[in-house]
């Protein structure tokens, strides 16, 4: 009788999923138990059958990836269990955040009572031989000029606005008369003037905000047109200096439940681009995962192994998944700095969708070396890679208008600029010493871990005496935008809450005035929405007062002449025209700049102009929609409402009609009711409000139609909303697109079930598990309970928290794997088989070992 006639079917099935020769498989088929199989695979005696699967992890790994041994990636932990060297050895550096003192009254009281306040920033780590930079004086002068321009423009516009409003001044309200009349009579008399004053105040704030954007774009236009910016940071380096061996740079990519195929495609494209520069030995790559979805976590493990094997990046590309997700992204970076930050001079932070060229990265290192007082150099990422109509219009807008605003920011701020949290290089030593973030004190929605960490880190870097620059003209930095309006708004809600939190730091001691202004502009980015909304509501209320209240023309006894409400339509037209110019002239200047520099990459002069006009129309339609959403976000933040919004997963990134109705339905209803109210009050006023109410009533179809991929691709085919990165794509983006498609082709589905049952996936998961405790009875009891619970409830009912604990524990995961097979738990085995059958790209069985082609012999 042959062995195949008596060996359990599950054992043959297990062997079929190990890549080995038929001879090896036949030899192992004589095993009578799975414990014996694992013992023979490991080629060492196993004293405890429960630990048999753990003993064979190394052999199962090398059968699937024999280059792990060649790269010396296999190691053992303190308990002698096999592990993968997915991270470098830990060399800890002290990272101590300074507690925030946000209350100026408390600081003043501590000073009066002699209690110590935080010490002044220590600039001893700055290079001593640097002369005082002239750019600091120039920057201060420029910002005073900007302030004068903004305030002067706002005062003139405010005087025009005051002349437009019907009730001129409060002089017609008699205080003596107010004391002799009822409260209702007083309220009715004062109401028009109170409304008018509020409208004037809101107009001044909003006009000043628009004016700041206009002057920023105008100076950016002049900078880019002339090309004579002697303070641009990119001019500090010739661009061909050798990078010294000590200037090591870590590229860190914090991720959390991201699109795994796209993340590792961009990482691979960036890695290969750096390798092409010949400076790969100066860079290390870190994927820092905060993922808490087990299927995604297992897919990340496999993707890391695949990209290391494909690029021969073992020892250069590292992967770590945190078990304790403290302080979100900033905490993830803190953990990296604490463990490995001292080994690197610089750090480049990447987003999950970031791609950077090797030339850009090496240029950033050279700029840091050439500018010893620079703490952060931020690039201007170019948006690309999206196909929906909405995303294509947005990436066209950022590509066409963005350079003006970025160059303008640099003109006004110079070395006291923004940091956007990604696609930037950071000097590690001052970042570790000065930029660790303590949680905000207190309770409520604006306390706790800082959400928008980037602005705060830039402010702390500048407070410590280091420069923060924008390299606005440095090419080779790319990112992706949300595919549709609702995904963008979901991101905006997080940013809104984070920027409102940051404003608590506005009066923190030692902050530079520029970064106090950055906190203020961050708040105004979202607070301007409710201010605009209230401005429109008050304007409608003033219209109602003028329409419904009987005007009083004679306010004093024996008054000879009536006092008529004043209307100056010519001033209204002039003010309206001026506002339109401030809003849309930067877009026209952007297109003029493209005409002057060359419009071929944008589809030609005609196509780029038509694209600009279409984008302007689209922005007009979406501005009121964003206004209402941002108003809701601001109110939600102040009221402490939960900031979660779980949109359904969509493969084509399009918005379903049902979801659009759910999200935009109240806006549509508000727009219709508002239009009816204004029409009833004064039909002629409806023309002024039409852009608002029509946009709200069209929000549902606009949101759905703009999210369609086929419309975006058709627009690209017709060369509308075309950008140079599509007309002549750089190699990094071509590679990213190629690798994304390849990764999606063999992307791992239902990863946790594979990690439990599949012989190869289980070996990888056990080798990468990070919860490596020493032997202890309480831990053993917990492990046994977790394994028993998983076997009892099965994969369908096992919650994500239990899955995470199993995935993090190599011993528990190995025991679960062994018991599923040896005890024949059909629920787990059936789920695993179903996952393989559902995968159209699963390999044929039985698996055969990879045969390496013989290397050519050089003669």
UniProtKB/Swiss-Prot annotation:
It is a multi-pass membrane protein. Its EC number is 2.4.1.-. Keywords: Cell inner membrane, Cell membrane, Glycosyltransferase, Membrane, Transferase, Transmembrane, Transmembrane helix. It is found in: Cell inner membrane. GO terms for molecular function: hexosyltransferase activity. The chain crosses the membrane at residues 144-166, 200-222, 523-545, 573-595, 608-630, 684-706. GO terms for cellular component: plasma membrane. It is an enzyme of class 2 (transferase). Coiled coil: none annotated. It holds the Pfam family Glycos_transf_2. One of its GO terms (biological process) is glucan biosynthetic process. Pathway: Glycan metabolism; osmoregulated periplasmic glucan (OPG) biosynthesis. InterPro entries: Glucans_biosynth_gluTrFase_H, Glyco_trans_2-like, Glycosyltr_2/OpgH_subfam, Nucleotide-diphossugar_trans. Gene3D superfamilies: Spore Coat Polysaccharide Biosynthesis Protein SpsA, Chain A. Belongs to the glycosyltransferase 2 family. OpgH subfamily. HAMAP family: MdoH_OpgH (MF_01072). Involved in the biosynthesis of osmoregulated periplasmic glucans (OPGs). NCBIfam families: PRK05454.1-1, PRK05454.2-1, PRK05454.2-5. This is Glucans biosynthesis glucosyltransferase H. The gene is opgH.
């Amino acid at each position: 009788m042959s062995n195949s006639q008596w060996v359990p079917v599950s054992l043959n099935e297990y062997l079929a999923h190990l890549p080995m020769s038929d001879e090896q498989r036949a030899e192992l088929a004589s095993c009578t138990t799975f414990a014996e199989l694992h013992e023979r695979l490991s080629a060492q005696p196993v004293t405890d059958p429960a630990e048999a699967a753990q003993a064979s992890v190394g052999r199962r790994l090398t059968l699937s990836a024999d280059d792990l041994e060649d790269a010396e990636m296999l190691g053992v932990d303190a308990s002698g269990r096999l592990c993968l060297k997915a991270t470098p050895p830990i060399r800890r550096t002290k990272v101590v955040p300074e507690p925030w003192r946000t209350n100026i009254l408390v600081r003043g009281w501590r000073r009066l009572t002699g209690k110590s306040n935080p010490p002044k920033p220590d600039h001893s780590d700055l290079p001593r031989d640097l002369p005082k930079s002239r750019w600091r004086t120039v920057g201060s002068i420029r910002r005073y000029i900007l302030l004068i321009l903004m305030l002067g423009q706002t005062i003139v516009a405010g005087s025009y606005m005051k002349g437009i409003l019907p009730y001129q001044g409060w002089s017609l309200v008699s205080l003596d008369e107010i004391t002799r009349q009822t409260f209702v009579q007083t309220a009715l008399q004062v109401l028009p003037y109170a409304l008018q004053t509020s409208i004037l105040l809101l107009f001044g704030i909003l006009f000043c905000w628009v004016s700041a954007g206009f002057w920023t774009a105008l100076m950016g236009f002049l900078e880019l047109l002339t090309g004579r910016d002697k303070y641009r940071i990119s001019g500090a380096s010739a661009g061909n200096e050798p990078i010294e061996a000590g200037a090591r740079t870590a590229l860190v990519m914090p991720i959390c439940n991201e699109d795994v195929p796209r993340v590792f495609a961009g990482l691979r494209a960036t890695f290969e681009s750096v390798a092409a520069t010949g400076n790969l030995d100066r860079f290390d790559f870190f994927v820092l995962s905060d993922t808490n979805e087990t299927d995604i976590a297992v897919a990340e493990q496999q993707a890391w192994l695949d990209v290391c094997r494909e690029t021969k990046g073992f020892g250069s590309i590292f992967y770590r998944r945190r078990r304790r997700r403290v302080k979100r992204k900033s905490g993830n970076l803190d953990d990296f700095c604490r463990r490995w930050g001292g080994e690197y001079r610089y750090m480049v932070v990447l987003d999950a969708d970031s791609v950077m060229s090797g030339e850009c990265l090496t240029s950033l290192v050279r700029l840091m070396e050439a500018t010893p007082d620079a703490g952060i150099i931020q690039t201007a990422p170019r948006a690309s890679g999206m196909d929906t109509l909405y995303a294509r219009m947005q990436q066209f807008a950022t590509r066409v208008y963005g350079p003006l605003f970025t160059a303008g920011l640099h003109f006004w701020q110079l070395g006291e600029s923004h940091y956007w949290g990604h696609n930037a290089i950071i000097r590690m030593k001052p970042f570790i010493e000065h930029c660790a973030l303590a949680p905000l004190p207190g309770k409520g929605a604006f306390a706790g871990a800082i959400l928008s960490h980037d602005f705060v880190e830039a402010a702390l870097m500048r407070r410590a005496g280091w420069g923060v620059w924008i390299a606005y003209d440095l090419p080779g930095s790319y990112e992706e935008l949300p595919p549709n309006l609702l995904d963008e708004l979901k991101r905006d809600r997080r940013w809104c809450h984070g920027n409102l939190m940051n404003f608590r730091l506005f009066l923190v001691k030692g902050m530079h005035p520029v970064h106090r202004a950055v906190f203020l502009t961050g708040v105004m980015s979202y607070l301007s929405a409710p201010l605009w909304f209230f401005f429109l509501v008050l304007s409608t209320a003033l219209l109602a007062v003028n329409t419904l209240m009987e005007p009083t023309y004679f306010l004093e006894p024996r008054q000879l002449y009536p006092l008529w409400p004043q209307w100056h339509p010519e001033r209204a037209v002039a003010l309206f025209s001026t506002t339109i110019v401030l809003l849309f002239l930067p877009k026209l200047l952007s297109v003029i700049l493209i005409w002057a520099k060359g419009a071929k990459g944008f589809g030609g002069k005609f196509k780029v102009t038509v694209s600009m006009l279409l984008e302007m129309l689209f922005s007009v339609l979406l501005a009121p929609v964003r206004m209402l959403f941002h108003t809701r976000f601001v109110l939600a933040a102040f009221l402490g409402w939960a900031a979660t919004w779980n949109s359904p997963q969509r493969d084509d990134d399009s918005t379903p009609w049902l979801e659009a109705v759910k999200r935009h339905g109240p806006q549509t209803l508000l727009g219709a009711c508002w239009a009816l109210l204004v029409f009833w009050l004064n039909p002629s006023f409806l023309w002024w409000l039409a852009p608002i109410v029509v946009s709200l009533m069209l929000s549902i179809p606009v949101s759905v139609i703009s999210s369609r991929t086929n419309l975006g691709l058709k627009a690209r085919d017709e060369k509308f909303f075309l950008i140079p990165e599509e007309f002549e794509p750089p190699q990094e983006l071509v590679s990213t697109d190629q690798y994304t498609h390849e990764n999606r082709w063999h992307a791992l589905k239902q990863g946790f079930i594979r990690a439990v049952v599949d012989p190869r996936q289980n070996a990888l998961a056990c080798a990468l598990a990070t919860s490596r405790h020493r032997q202890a009875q309480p831990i053993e009891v917990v492990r046994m309970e977790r394994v028993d619970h998983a076997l009892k409830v099965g994969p369908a009912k096992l919650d994500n928290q239990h899955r995470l604990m199993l995935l993090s524990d190599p011993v528990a995961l190995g025991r679960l794997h062994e018991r599923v097979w040896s005890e024949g738990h059909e629920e787990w085995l059936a789920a695993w088989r179903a996952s393989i059958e559902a995968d159209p790209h699963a390999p044929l069985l039985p698996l055969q070992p990879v045969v390496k082609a013989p290397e050519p012999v050089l003669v």
